[in-house]
Amino acid sequence: MVLKKRRQEAVSKSISKKQGAPVEGLIAALSSEDDAKRVKARHSLVAMGKAAVPLLAEALKKGDGLVRWEAAKALGEIGVSEAAPPLVKALEDEEFDVRWLAAIGLIGMNIKGLKPLLHALMEQGDSVFLREGAHHVIHDLAKGGLRKYLAPVLAALENVEPAISVPQAAFHALEMLEKKRMVSNTWKHSQ
């Protein structure tokens, strides 16, 4: 894990030093019909780490289904906390595969992706796609040490009236996690 992070940082530094780096070309290659070209572009973006997150987040919002799929997969593989908000937003994507990859990415982030997810549930608890994706993520995360914090949110997601019960359960879970300092109590909402 440490070697992966160091490699991503080194690649990010070398790319940021180059003027006019071909990052946009890599994003464009995510829509290629050529599987090998698309996978190579995604791997290059993942190797960039945090530096690729803003462009991937934009591709996740504006690209076609294939581009959004690749962007969601790349953001999940990068796994930095900055990738969580766009992945949370992708839980509402029209394509099931994109929503699934966003959930898998958030599960892989563990607690790093939890705060933006809980915020989204507080603000948009009426979104069916968001609740379905959140259920997938929270169900997996509640299997570990986060169970006592997330079990009420999971119960609310499975409730007869989740649109009413989920925002409050998410608020209380976030409040408990902040009190235990498991998540920071400052969070910048970005969309």
Feature locations, PLM:
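Structural detector for internal amphipathic alpha-helices that build alpha-solenoid repeat scaffolds
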Residues: 2-20, 28, 35-50, 55-61, ...
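Buried hydrophobic core positions in alpha-solenoid tandem helical repeats
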Residues: 25-27, 55-57, 86-88, 116-121, ...
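Helix-adjacent hinge/juxtasegments
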Residues: 94-98
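Terminal, non-catalytic domain-edge segments
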Residues: 180-191
